[in-house]
Amino acid sequence: MGKFKINGGKRLYGEVEVHGAKNSILPILAATILNEGVSVIHNCPRLKDVDSMIEILEHIGCKVSFSGRDIVVDARDVKDSEIPDNLMRTMRSSIFLMGALIARNKKAFISFPGGCDIGHRPIDLHLKGLKKLGVEIEESYGYIRCKGVRVRGNEIHLDLPSVGATENIMLAATLADGITVIRNAAKEPEIEDLQNFLNSMGARITGAGTNTIVIEGVKKLHDTEYTIIPDRIVAGTYLCAAAMTRGELTVVKALKEHLEPLISKLKETGCELKTGNDYIKITCNKRPKAVDMIVTLPYPGFPTDLQPQIVSVLSIAEGTSIVTETIFDNRFKYTEELVRMGADIKVEGRVAVIRGVDKITGAKVLAKDLRGGVALVIAGLGAEGTTVVEGAEHIDRGYESLEKALKSVGADIVRIM
């Protein structure tokens, strides 16, 4: 297990660039197998989860090359429809291959996926939606066997606006007979990115970014070249790191329209933020103020994936803040580690009460998941003394060379084994 060693108290200053969106590249990589040809994808992040998805694609018969920021997927020889358990367990996003394999090979055999342990994340919505398209599904002993001899369009109303279920249904319906309508669809920018990628291959999809998505099935897709959007969660993480260190940071390739809830809350803490077409500049010259309330919600609400980072900032804010987590039921585990650093945080179910302290101090802490782990790095940047964050492999799932990016803007951080 790798670790990050951080000597805190260094003000972040300068310019940092955001890499491509993790939550776009993973479903888009799954989507490449719908095209019996070659797909070229630009602005790809080098992440542990991306490596895992590439390994799965290669296992089922794809030829994949990753050079610089570009991934080329040749999916002409996709034959296998079974993904081994050891590959499925590496990340939750492997579930996207289910819808894609059904569309391409009319069948899929997978185990339940892995990923961060941040609470109950059932795939019932995925399976329910696929069944509405005519897919036969058999579950036994942790495995899922799908058969979709003739996938037909249908109207599907999601019980919850699940990102994963929305994307899996989109993938399965792209080559289906007839028209599929997804109601109460998730609205995240990454879903719109997936729509745009599929349409660049010849799919006929409209409505992504709204609560109703319409997919008109087509017979065949063609080769494409596509650039994915910047990662809004990485951009938000850098903004929180600047707020934690009372820094001045320009985050390049950050789209303000994807980050309005965070920008609003950071302004409430007293930070100054200026935005342009592809950047956000944050200036924080004093101790942050508490915010009355943050409630995580599906997009365009405050993102659950930025909840841990903002809590780190609020741990040293002046006053008391209340944060309510409505998406995942076990996402406050990291607060135990913040308390080890001197934070005053009380968690009751889905609600955290954060009483800001004058300072937190360095400690040895453990990253238990991706976003909670990076929140501990942020805390270490603003802490007095040295912090060691164990479990760097969790953070590597969503951040490319995090220590290099932070070091480039003044952080004293190194990776150690």
Curated annotation (Swiss-Prot):
Source domain of life: Bacteria
Enzymatic reactions: phosphoenolpyruvate + UDP-N-acetyl-alpha-D-glucosamine = UDP-N-acetyl-3-O-(1-carboxyvinyl)-alpha-D-glucosamine + phosphate
Gene3D superfamilies given in the database record: Enolpyruvate transferase domain
CDD domains: UdpNAET
Gene Ontology terms: cellular component: cytoplasm
Keyword Cell wall biogenesis/degradation assigned: yes
EC annotation from Swiss-Prot or TrEMBL: 2.5.1.7
Protein name in the entry: UDP-N-acetylglucosamine 1-carboxyvinyltransferase 2
